[in-house]
């Protein structure tokens, strides 16, 4: 079932207010908490949607530079030892990698939506790659 947007509605009626006796008795028997306030929590999905909007607006790289550079050097080590990289080359690789991943996740999300889900799964990534012709 598709999710629909919830809107606040004014209550038109319901239970009558309780008598004060029950609340006074409960307040006397319960120990004083000293006014400890619960930390504010957003509803599930609110922060995720905010992050989606934030990262769609931004253009900065999302993977940290040094861990990515170590990964590039580790992969390059398998092909040839003692390779040196210009910083601009590593940056170009990172830009291309992030652009590829963003596109893959967009297609993956479309696959999940097509399956009437809102959660992406490994099978969505596999389907997206298969449709693209990257993996048989």
Swiss-Prot record:
One of its GO terms (molecular function) is protein heterodimerization activity. The keyword Ribonucleoprotein does not apply. GO terms for cellular component: nucleosome; nucleus. CDD domains: HFD_H3. The modification Phosphoserine is found at residue 11. Keywords: Acetylation, Chromosome, DNA-binding, Methylation, Nucleosome core, Nucleus, Phosphoprotein. Pfam families: Histone (PF00125). Acetylation is generally linked to gene activation. Methylation at Lys-5 is linked to gene activation. Methylation at Lys-10 is linked to gene repression. PROSITE patterns: HISTONE_H3_1, HISTONE_H3_2. The modification N6-methylated lysine is found at residues 5, 10, 28, 37, 80. Residues 1-42 are annotated as: Disordered. It is found in: Nucleus; Chromosome. SUPFAM superfamilies: Histone-fold. InterPro entries: Histone-fold (IPR009072), Histone_H2A/H2B/H3 (IPR007125), Histone_H3/CENP-A (IPR000164). The keyword Nucleus applies. The modification N6-acetyllysine is found at residues 10, 15, 24. Gene3D superfamilies: Histone, subunit A. Residues 22-33 have a biased composition (Low complexity). Belongs to the histone H3 family. The nucleosome is a histone octamer containing two molecules each of H2A, H2B, H3 and H4 assembled in one H3-H4 heterotetramer and two H2A-H2B heterodimers. The octamer wraps approximately 147 bp of DNA. Core component of nucleosome. Nucleosomes wrap and compact DNA into chromatin, limiting DNA accessibility to the cellular machineries which require DNA as a template. Histones thereby play a central role in transcription regulation, DNA repair, DNA replication and chromosomal stability. DNA accessibility is regulated via a complex set of post-translational modifications of histones, also called histone code, and nucleosome remodeling. This is Histone H3.
């Amino acid at each position: 079932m598709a999710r629909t947007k919830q809107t606040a509605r004014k209550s038109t009626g319901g239970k009558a207010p309780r008598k004060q006796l029950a609340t006074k008795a409960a307040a006397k028997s319960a120990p004083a908490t000293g006014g400890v306030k619960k930390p504010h929590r957003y509803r599930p999905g609110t922060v995720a949607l905010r992050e989606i909007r934030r990262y769609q607006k931004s253009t900065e790289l999302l993977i940290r530079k040094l861990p990515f550079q170590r990964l590039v050097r580790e992969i390059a080590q398998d092909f040839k030892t003692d390779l040196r990289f210009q910083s601009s080359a590593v940056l170009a690789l990172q830009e291309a990698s992030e652009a590829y991943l963003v596109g893959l996740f967009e297609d993956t999300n479309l696959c999940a939506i097509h399956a009437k889900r809102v959660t992406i799964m490994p099978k969505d990534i596999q389907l997206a790659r298969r449709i693209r012709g990257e993996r048989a």
